[in-house]
Amino acid sequence: GVGFKAGVKDYRLTYYTPEYKTKDTDILAAFRMTPQPGVPAEEAGAAVAAESSTGTWTTVWTDGLTSLDRYKGRCYDIEPVAGEENQYIAYVAYPLDLFEEGSVTNMLTSIVGNVFGFKALRALXXEDLRIPPAYSKTFMGPPHGIQVERDKLNKYGRPLLGCTIKPKLGLSAKNYGRAVYECLRGGLDFTKDDENVNSQPFMRWRDRFLFVAEALFKSQAETGEIKGHYLNATAGTCEEMLKRAVFARELGVPIVMHDYLTGGFTANTSLAFYCRDNGLLLHIHRAMHAVIDRQKNHGMHFRVLAKALRMSGGDHIHAGTVVGKLEGEREVTLGFVDLLRDDYIEKDRSRGIYFTQDWVSMPGVFPVASGGIHVWHMPALTEIFGDDSVLQFGGGTLGHPWGNAPGAVANRVALEACVQARNEGRDLAREGNEIIREACK
């Protein structure tokens, strides 16, 4: 026989390797697969491994010029999903050499770039990734992290409080700054630009930054506490985004903000580097996440987006609430909250954690609870999220019948009451409403 045999071949001959022992340096992925009727699970799993690594639909002569064995992704395990018909979890191991160092963009392009449109699959969802220290060490990660942020703000032993300024679109810069001042003066730690506030005709970014900085310094002088406002630096180009971050630094404010999914991981990582080099904290909003993570059987779970963000860099990230207006299952939410802030997270399928993740010493990210929460949720939030979190009340502050500042006071008083009650050993789940009522007096 001459050369090699061309033609379409079964992926599972090369890419389904149940005997494979995973390496410490491999990136591991768990995919929830729904194969098309008549496609065996092994073939589907192998196809996923092939298409997201070295495979193509036919044998090519250039395969002879490289070592497939060294570079191919391998589907090393498949398990049926309990309670679902024709759904499987496929485990795939990728050799580290397939990925560019320090690039979340390249990691995602490789793992989820192409394979989700694959004909043999009806649906595919990336449930989790195991990032080996050999790879995570090539990333800077969060510009500062939880501990450094607490030291910069001089705030300890409690969750931090935030508030999104509403109405999100339409206020002039001067009135916007006024709303910021009232909230911070009332006792909040942070206020926030809404994710869609960038630089629109009714309020250009530079004017907003100036009036907000004035509000910050005034409220700081009056309360003796460090205050912040997440100035949204998200823009249409990376250059413009960095220009806004530079101006924020020149004003001397403590924190800026970015929409990391719409802005993109490349822009986000650039901004994170700038923030670390210039002492700015970085707040991350997850606008667009539900487009990717809402469907159970197709897309990417938020825990994958959360891991990607911790690598790319951010000091805060929105992470659902467990109690407010947006959906979130408690155990699963706490699973990715721990993936954001802890050093070492044990595999625990009941919390949706498919792999043990060791971040070594990469800084942690504050999870932000935001969306439809108000003062009566405070005991539950304090209990669920613990101290290392940011609790954000938009309408729950500005909707106070007496105005913004009293709304802010109410939130701060409720938080302090819950933290004190917890520290005294009271049961927040049972006595929550009572604790809030006492605090109202």
UniProtKB/Swiss-Prot annotation:
GO molecular function, one term: monooxygenase activity
GO cellular component entries: chloroplast
Residues modified as N6,N6,N6-trimethyllysine: K5
Keywords: Calvin cycle, Carbon dioxide fixation, Chloroplast, Disulfide bond, Lyase, Magnesium, Metal-binding, Methylation, Monooxygenase, Oxidoreductase, Photorespiration, Photosynthesis, Plastid
Broad class of the protein's primary localization: plastid
GO aspect biological process, one term: reductive pentose-phosphate cycle
EC numbers on record: 4.1.1.39
Processing and modification events after translation: The disulfide bond which can form in the large chain dimeric partners within the hexadecamer appears to be associated with oxidative stress and protein turnover.
Catalysed reaction equations from the record: 2 (2R)-3-phosphoglycerate + 2 H(+) = D-ribulose 1,5-bisphosphate + CO2 + H2O; D-ribulose 1,5-bisphosphate + O2 = 2-phosphoglycolate + (2R)-3-phosphoglycerate + 2 H(+)
N6-carboxylysine modifications at: K192
Annotated site residues (Transition state stabilizer) in this chain: K325
InterPro entries reported in the protein's UniProt record: RuBisCO, RuBisCo_large_chain_AS, RuBisCO_lsu_C, RuBisCO_lsu_C_sf, RuBisCO_lsu_fd_N, RuBisCO_lsu_N_sf, RuBisCO_lsuI
Signal peptide, first to last residue: none
Catalytic EC class: lyase
Annotated localization: Plastid, Chloroplast
Active site residues per record: K166, H285
Binding positions (substrate): N114, T164, K168, R286, H318, S370
Assembly with partners or alone: Heterohexadecamer of 8 large chains and 8 small chains; disulfide-linked. The disulfide link is formed within the large subunit homodimers.
Comment field (misc): The basic functional RuBisCO is composed of a large chain homodimer in a 'head-to-tail' conformation. In form I RuBisCO this homodimer is arranged in a barrel-like tetramer with the small subunits forming a tetrameric 'cap' on each end of the 'barrel'.
Family: Belongs to the RuBisCO large chain family. Type I subfamily.
Identification of the protein by name: Ribulose bisphosphate carboxylase large chain
Gene: rbcL
